[in-house]
Amino acid sequence: FNFPLFFLQSLIKKLIPSNPCVLVDDGKGEPLVLQMNDSAKALGVRKDMPLALVERLGGITILERNKEIEKKEADSLLLWAGKFSPLVVDKFPDGLLVEVKGSLKLFGGQEKLIKKMSDDLDDLGYKFAFATGATPLLAEIGAKKRRKEDVSNRFTSKEINTVPVSMFSFLPKQLELLKKMGVRTLGDYKKLPRKGLAERFGKDALQQFDRLYGYEPDPQ
């Protein structure tokens, strides 16, 4: 499960769509926009916009980031997920991973389990996206790539081939090199010779890639 507005919704869970709302963070030395809802986007608010510019727009609710509250909200969501599986991985601020295979029989199958979890999050007011996958990284990247869909949400190795390399755990310098090489998607990257990949990007990047596709176990 991925929570695209986690920072903002840790302070206001049930956002009113018609009310522009932004969350600012001064971690870079000055207050900058970290997250905003769709109404604020429609007014021209963008990530990393200075607070002074947001204030000039007027009519926007402005909230300051609170890491203590975020920690409490993350802990609460992890505890909630524990109702459905004993295997839950903390991926906040992005979200969480839940190993559901062992819980399917108890909840009547995957569709019913995912629906129950989705209904719970809807009741709590969270905006979220989700995906299932054969590997943890498949599910994680799938949830980031998708908006909330129906329960037919399995993210496959074939689909991951279309994902931009910018969504994988490459460093900025590595992304720049891939761009120069004409590599845009993970499918493009997969076609490159493994020996050359290890030399250019290191064994860690190659190992993560193998875990993504299930070629190597992922001990999360």
Model segments located where?
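Residues that scaffold, gate, or flank divalent-cation-dependent active/transport sites
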Residues: 1-97, 102-104, 109-119, 128, ...
